[in-house]
Every structure is written in C-alpha cells, then in structure tokens.
Amino acid sequence: MRIINSKEQIVIILRPSRIDIEFPRINKNLINKLLEKAQVILSDLSWILEHPLGNRIAFRSDFCIFDDELNAMRALSKNLNVVTNSNETTEMSIRLNTPEVIQGEPVNIVTNINNAIIGVKKDQEETKRKSSLITYDVNTVVTNTENRFEFETLLPYYEEMINNVFERSEHFN
C-alpha cells in the first residue's frame, strides 16, 4: 500500500514486513526535523506489522552523503529511537542518494549507520543496539532492476566491497 501526503510530499509505503518512508527534495538544514517526523510515523504505524523485518527512511534529495562522510551519517542517525510492538528485530536504515548518483554508478554503495532501539516498548533499555550496515545495490534504475540481486553482477566489484567493509568497520564506534 502506498500513502502519499501531498502537502508535505511524504511517501509512506506499507510492505508485508517493512515500512518505507521517502522524503523527496530534502533541505539539508531540515533533516533532523524530518527524522523526528519519520520516527513518529514509524512508531504510529508499527502496530500494523506483526513481524517487522525493517524500517527504512529513504531520502530522495538534492545532496548526497558519501561513504567517507561517516561523521555526517552518525549525526543523522544518533537520535533514532524506533520501538515496535513486536519482539522481532527491527532495523532502521538511512540512505541518502541523489538520483544522479544512483543512475551514474553501475553499483550503488551506501553506508547505513543504524542506531535503533528494537523490541517491545517496555524493554527499551535492554533492546538498544548500534550497528553499521554497508549495502551494495546494483544500480536500481528501472532499466536494470532484473540485475539487482544477481551476485555475478557484483563480482567485478568484490574486492572493493570487501575493502570498504573492513575500512568502515574499523572506524565505527
């Protein structure tokens, strides 16, 4: 199900096991306010999902935060506190990419820094966790969707991916 708030241009997509929130045309100075708004939306909608596998905030914006800007990613995600009504693990991922970046690369490498509270609301202190997730998507433009999950397509980039994982994990705290 796709819900569109035309006034604020927020798109909420309810999937079988995930809630996606997309904010198009983001002003860099308003990100913290948008994160707070997304947090409220996710908390309000979390009861819909019996077994949520993840919550994703997707920013479609005029700027991009690249993999090497970890401090900026940490600043964006440090205050995320989304607690679902389920004991299932919930993952909050923040992805910031301009359409130009996604369309201009054969492989879209995105660092997701996650700091979400997971689990039942009464157990907030026991369910905190912090994680660094590095994802690699084959270009997700419409013309290339059939290759998105084919491992063979990623093979030419395998060494770069491994190096990226080790480098990012060494600096994550």
Predicted segment positions?
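Short, conserved charged micro-motifs
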Residues: 29-33, 69-72, 145-153
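Solvent-exposed loop and beta-edge segments used for protein-protein assembly and interaction
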Residues: 13-15, 51-53, 128-132
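Aromatic- and glycine-enriched beta-alpha-beta binding-site module
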Residues: 22-65
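Aromatic/basic-lined ligand-recognition segments
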Residues: 57-137
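Generic detector of solvent-exposed, compositionally biased contiguous segments
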Residues: 1, 5-7, 27-32, 103-117
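Mixed-charge, glycine-accented linear interaction segment located at domain edges/termini
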Residues: 108-173
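Signature of extracytoplasmic/envelope-associated structural regions
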Residues: 8-9, 44-50, 80-84, 139-141
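N-terminal low-complexity, intrinsically disordered segments
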Residues: 1-24
